[in-house]
Amino acid sequence: MKIARFTEGGTTRLGLVVAAGAATDTGEIIDVGSADPSLPTDVGVLLASGDLTRLGRTAGTAARLALSAVKLEAPIAQPPTFLAIGLNYADHVAESGMTKPAAPVVFNKQITCVIGPGDGVEIPTAAPDWVDYEGELGVVIGTRCRNVSVADAPSVVAGYMIVNDVSVRDWQRATPTMTMGKSWDTHGPTGPWLVTADEIADPHDLGIRTWVDGELRQDASTKQMITNCWELIAHLSTAFTLLPGTIIATGTPAGVGFAMDPPGCMKAGSTVRIEIDQLGVLENPVIAQP
């Protein structure tokens, strides 16, 4: 299933996306949220309830809406935790002038940074010069879990989506920890929907591409990860409990703006488009902070 959170007619609800391909302006959405008003209006809340089958009970009779007629929202508006991994592609390690880490580099993005498709990524007034994009595969946890083995890790995954780990590079590098450079409001675009795990045969063989204003900047595969999704889940859950709806952004490949010569960071007026095979497209305009 492709589970979307969307707004139409002044209300936000859940739906099932069909026949969309990679685009978010073609295809339809089955309006299960209207057909069953008892459904949660957030994918994270639905996952916490432990019953995804509720979505299918009214799918056969629910109305269908054109995707172009609705506003897609972040699938999980307030994840319990938004974790991210740094330096998880060797080519990005190299372009950053760093050495391969001995263990996964883990940091938090504050959940207030989450936005959805089409929402504006703000260039902060206080830090306008080094605002960068990072196209990433997002893994979403579906089951409360702790001490998960690598072998069992697939069983705790609800699905996948696209994440743009927007980064304010000068703030990121000002301190040993990255949270302040990674958590500005609007700097966590996610979407365009959650693709359930059963639809992705291998999350470690997906093409990932990022464009800025039509220029291809990142073109890689998730097979290039240093620490794969299952290993990351095992590592993280050794230390702390993972809750349903937790987002894990698994790192970005080479091609980020700060590493270009001259630098190619985002500016107000830019558009960033990220596409991951089988997951769709996440596109956001870049705007000045109001």
What function would you assign to each model-found segment?
Residues K100-P117, V131-Y133, K267-Q278:
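Structural signature of FAD isoalloxazine-binding scaffolds in flavoprotein oxidoreductases
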Residues C145-V148, E199-A201:
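Short helix-loop capping/hinge motifs at secondary-structure junctions, enriched
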